[in-house]
């Protein structure tokens, strides 16, 4: 690993070799080159972060190393915690809402069933009233037909037999209307 101290030592060694007599000049310069090359093997450039040359000798571009800051990491951790809490709260709220909806639906169905029961009882009482009124009307028609038949019998006997058949037909028709009203389901009244 190259430090400024290593650089100084390498320069001194190169300078010392250059001070030797000129006889061995060629021999002395070569070792200095070899020494500097040997030192460069362990030297790392601070610009491109590669071994083999000094920073001032670098011809490459500076490499960007992404080092996330501690504050950014802490912010991410806080956001994750907040998101987890929000998810848990939303899950809890949805569960509560589901329970509330179930309770509402149960209460609505029970109230609707009770209201339908009460409306059914109301309609049945109304149908009973209509059947009693129709039966009273039938009895009125029977009396009128019987009175007409009695007046007809005073005039002629043949007409009285005809009126008796008329009264019997009217009574049979009234019974058929009663039976049909009992078979049909009660009709609901429209509310205004």
Curated annotation (Swiss-Prot):
It comes from the Eukaryota. Pfam families: zf-CCHC_3. The gene is ZCCHC10. This is Zinc finger CCHC domain-containing protein 10. A zinc finger (CCHC-type) spans 43-60. Residues 89-192 are annotated as: Disordered. PANTHER family: ZCCHC10 PROTEIN, ZINC FINGER CCHC DOMAIN-CONTAINING PROTEIN 10. Keywords: Metal-binding, Zinc, Zinc-finger. GO terms for molecular function: nucleic acid binding; zinc ion binding. It comes from Homo sapiens. The lineage of its organism: Eukaryota, Metazoa, Chordata, Craniata, Vertebrata. InterPro entries: ZCCHC10 (IPR039715), Znf_CCHC_sf (IPR036875). Residues 109-136, 144-179 have a biased composition (Low complexity).
